[in-house]
């Protein structure tokens, strides 16, 4: 984290704002984007005097100003988009980074047990590896091996890892995901 230049950060799909508040404590001025009004209210209270601006918006329509963020975080949010929504957003995210700015993204991958459950249950697959869900998110996309890396291939990939982790939910043995850390060239 020390090598990331301080400045403005963008936290997409911030939820309750845990990452946004932590980033603000590390010296960033944070735009925290969240569509769920319950979470935006919680974050508005949680942030206190921290430099966190709550942006109530769907991430697919949030206007990312070109070259304005030294850090963009998309933790556990991009898999709730269809690939046809993901690629245009990924382009805007890359354009939104300042020269030398960093991007951190984390997603579910197709070897996650949830993928198998949805496929075997007959849940409607609306795009490859993308299933229609009931509820707020509407869809879930499980990234194929190397897909997250390809989405952000315009950046210098500093770290890319696909792994399985023990799940917090005792009914699920593990989760599978991909983590990407990348940097925009000077």
Q: Which stretches of residues belong to each language-model region?
A:
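Class I (Rossmann-like) S-adenosyl-L-methionine-dependent methyltransferase catalytic domain
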Residues: 1-10, 15-64, 81, 88, ...
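Short catalytic micro-motifs in class I SAM-dependent methyltransferases
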Residues: 76-80
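A short glycine-rich, Lys/Arg-flanked "PGG" loop and its adjoining helix->strand segment in the class I
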Residues: 87-99
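A conserved beta-strand element that flanks and buttresses the S-adenosyl-L-methionine
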Residues: 73
């Amino acid at each position: 984290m020390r090598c990331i230049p301080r400045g403005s950060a963008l936290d997409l799909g911030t939820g309750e704002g845990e990452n946004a508040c932590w980033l603000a404590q590390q010296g960033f001025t944070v735009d925290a984007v969240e569509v769920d009004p319950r979470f935006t209210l919680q974050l508005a209270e949680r942030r206190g005097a921290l430099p966190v601006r709550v942006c109530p918006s769907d991430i697919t329509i949030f206007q990312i100003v070109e070259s304005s963020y030294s850090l963009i975080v998309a933790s556990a949010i991009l898999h709730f988009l269809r690939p046809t929504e993901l690629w245009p957003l990924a382009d805007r995210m890359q354009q939104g980074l300042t020269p030398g700015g960093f991007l951190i993204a984390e997603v579910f991958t197709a070897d996650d047990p949830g993928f198998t459950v949805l496929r075997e249950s007959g849940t409607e697959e609306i795009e490859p590896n993308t299933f229609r869900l009931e509820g707020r998110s509407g869809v879930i996309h499980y990234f194929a091996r190397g897909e997250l890396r390809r989405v952000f291939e315009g950046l210098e990939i500093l770290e890319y890892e696909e792994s399985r982790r023990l799940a917090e939910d005792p009914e699920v043995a593990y989760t599978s995901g991909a983590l990407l850390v990348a940097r925009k060239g000077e």
